[in-house]
Amino acid sequence: MEEFYGELPLYDIRESKIINLANLGTHHFFEHEMAVIDTHVVQRLKYISQLGPVYNVFPTARHTRFEHTLGVTITLNKMWNSLSENGSLSFLGTGSKPRKILSDLRMSAILHDIGHCPFSHAHMFQKSF
């Protein structure tokens, strides 16, 4: 694994984990996902608000980009499972191809917010006149 992740600074935890989110329940994250989740670049999302300054109006509206990232990954997995169960993914065939695609999608979900800085979406709520 070290050769794959190269020089990424990793925390000591590298095994797979079960993570419990209050609104989405308990979910499994694999070893390679935890190796990325435990990097500083993803862990810093714990300190960036997903909702920007909304908590000034709604004091309990506190949600971090880290929580959002885990939620997106879990929701993606639920969507994949639903599509798989109803046969919508049959065109992918069987074997390792669908597993590889799901793995890539999950990693994309984990990494999708790492480039955001605080309040980066705040401009989306401004009205243009």
Regions found by a protein language model. Give the residues of each.
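Metal-dependent phosphohydrolase cores
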Residues: 1-129
